[in-house]
Amino acid sequence: MPQTLADMRRDYSRSGLCEAEAPLEPFSLFHQWFAEAMKTEQLPVEPNAMSLATVDGNGRPHCRVLLLKGVDERGFTFFSNYESAKGQQLRARPFAAMTFFWPTLERQVRIEGEVEKVSSQESDAYFQVRPLGSRLGAWASPQSRVIRDRTELEELLALTEKRFLDQAPHCPGHWGGYRLLPDRIEFWQGRASRLHDRLNYRLEKGGWVRERLAP
């Protein structure tokens, strides 16, 4: 018989997550897990792919998949068009949540916090290392706006290519980076019988508090 959605499941038995072996702050654990994901989640899977959830001014949630482009003790960095739908949502409510899922490792990381724009210098530095086509696309595409058809987009790209025929495209003012400043990071490790390990880090005035959550 064909498998139904109700029948689709897998058991997890690869590893565990113990408080005694976990660091007191979350960033070193994220770096460790991400390094392991880089080794196991082979292309075409992108280990730095994440879902990013935002909320608009009416309280309606929106979610999409983006690529993480930087992480340090300040937070998690991604780039976008500031005039896009997500840009408008972050302007109205500067908070977001992101989730990484690495199925080979049976792991998930959830991150929540306030979002700020990175400096123009950071945005420009990243923009300059992007492929030429991506840089031209940032100028050409009116992201999230309704367009007539694919032909209109190709026409906009052709105009942009003509504009920058004799010069390298610089970072447009409507494009740049955001940094999510985490106040909560949860590490999830799949375990047998759905009794998963969940270690949650929440930021308090005195620093990070580590706690185990029931699955």
Curated annotation (Swiss-Prot):
Substrate binds at R9, R10, D11, Y12, K69, Y126, R130, S134, R194, L195, H196. GO terms for molecular function: FMN binding; pyridoxamine phosphate oxidase activity. Binds 1 FMN per subunit. Its EC number is 1.4.3.5. The keyword Flavoprotein applies. InterPro entries: Pyridox_Oxase (IPR000659), Pyridox_Oxase_CS (IPR019740), Pyridox_Oxase_N (IPR011576), Pyridoxamine_oxidase_dimer_C (IPR019576), Split_barrel_FMN-bd (IPR012349). Disulfide bonds: none annotated. Its cofactor is FMN. FMN binds at R64, V65, L66, L67, L68, K69, F79, S80, K86, Q108, Q143, S144, W188, R198. Keywords: Flavoprotein, FMN, Oxidoreductase, Pyridoxine biosynthesis. Catalyzes the oxidation of either pyridoxine 5'-phosphate (PNP) or pyridoxamine 5'-phosphate (PMP) into pyridoxal 5'-phosphate (PLP). Homodimer. This is Pyridoxine/pyridoxamine 5'-phosphate oxidase. It comes from Azotobacter vinelandii (strain DJ / ATCC BAA-1303).
